[in-house]
Amino acid sequence: MTDELDDIHPILQGAPQTTEFRKLRKRIVRNVREALDQYGMVDGRDARWLVCLSGGKDSFTLLAALIELKWRGLLPVELLACNLDQGQPGFPATVLPEFLARMGIPHRIEYQDTYSIVVDKIPQGRTYCSLCSRLRRGNLYRIAREEGCSAIVLGHHRDDILETFFMNLFHGGRLATMPPKLVNEEGDLFVYRPLAFVAEADCERFARSMNYPIIPCDLCGSQDGLQRQQVKQILDGWEARSPGRRQVMFRALMNARPSHLLDPGLFDFAGLATGTASGRNGAEPPQLRGGD
């Protein structure tokens, strides 16, 4: 991958020319490409993706990485950036369309006042995030169908995935998280998370260094759920005491051993017999490359 200024998409023009930033940018693009490859997000057929742009650091990083891969001929997919303006008070409605137009990026801006619905349905003092997310997802599915897209692409990163795993573990009693690739309930659209291998800190450093017009995520006045905040604090503490712990825990999500857990739906314990090799239950899963 080259970094020559005359061979770069406008979304990356003006990038810092420091060695540190070049390494950061290459790491992000490499991690995104690995996720795309490892989880089969690009199948070789003509495809159109709806890339969801909230205006936060993560979605800007996602869009820039996908555009760079496409610009360099490594992502044979048509990209359509989409922002859903949900009617939150104070949302700067002109920021994203002006940015996308200036960058020459195909886009769709959709206004749907889901904020009023959420305020009406959620008791005062409760977080809006869950219902807001469901309403947003439904609208994004609709837009994807209207635009002839085969997938919607979201900006959840490694830390989001890890936090969701521990939220399910601590509060839901199950081993589950956000998968990097899934099919929606209707069965007609893929949902991709190409930032699955990218650390939140890398998204933060990248978007800030590029001076993208980041829009705060708390315009509605509701903070992210208390459970997620608590999990984030726990993970921050572990990382502070043992640097690199997040990456090790994330790698564990790619190295599951059903025969060493307790779910008979995943492993036939009742049918286990002597005379055969002990059940690693299949080949060693692939290991994460790259990382922090």
From Swiss-Prot:
InterPro entries: Rossmann-like_a/b/a_fold (IPR014729), TilS/TtcA_N (IPR011063), tRNA_Cyd_32_2_STrfase (IPR012089), tRNA_thiolation_TtcA_Ctu1 (IPR035107). GO terms for cellular component: cytoplasm. Its EC number is 2.8.1.-. It is found in: Cytoplasm. Pathway: tRNA modification. [4Fe-4S] cluster binds at C129, C132, C220. The thiolation reaction likely consists of two steps: a first activation step by ATP to form an adenylated intermediate of the target base of tRNA, and a second nucleophilic substitution step of the sulfur (S) atom supplied by the hydrosulfide attached to the Fe-S cluster. It catalyses: cytidine(32) in tRNA + S-sulfanyl-L-cysteinyl-[cysteine desulfurase] + AH2 + ATP = 2-thiocytidine(32) in tRNA + L-cysteinyl-[cysteine desulfurase] + A + AMP + diphosphate + H(+). The gene is ttcA. This is tRNA-cytidine(32) 2-sulfurtransferase. Pfam families: ATP_bind_3. Its cofactor is Mg(2+); [4Fe-4S] cluster. It comes from Cereibacter sphaeroides (strain ATCC 17025 / ATH 2.4.3) (Rhodobacter sphaeroides). A motif (PP-loop motif) lies at residues 54-59. Catalyzes the ATP-dependent 2-thiolation of cytidine in position 32 of tRNA, to form 2-thiocytidine (s(2)C32). The sulfur atoms are provided by the cysteine/cysteine desulfurase (IscS) system. Homodimer. Binds 1 [4Fe-4S] cluster per subunit. The cluster is chelated by three Cys residues, the fourth Fe has a free coordination site that may bind a sulfur atom transferred from the persulfide of IscS. One of its GO terms (molecular function) is sulfurtransferase activity. The keyword Nucleotide-binding applies. One of its GO terms (biological process) is tRNA thio-modification. The keyword Cytoplasm applies. Belongs to the TtcA family. Keywords: 4Fe-4S, ATP-binding, Cytoplasm, Iron, Iron-sulfur, Magnesium, Metal-binding, Nucleotide-binding, RNA-binding, Transferase, tRNA processing, tRNA-binding.
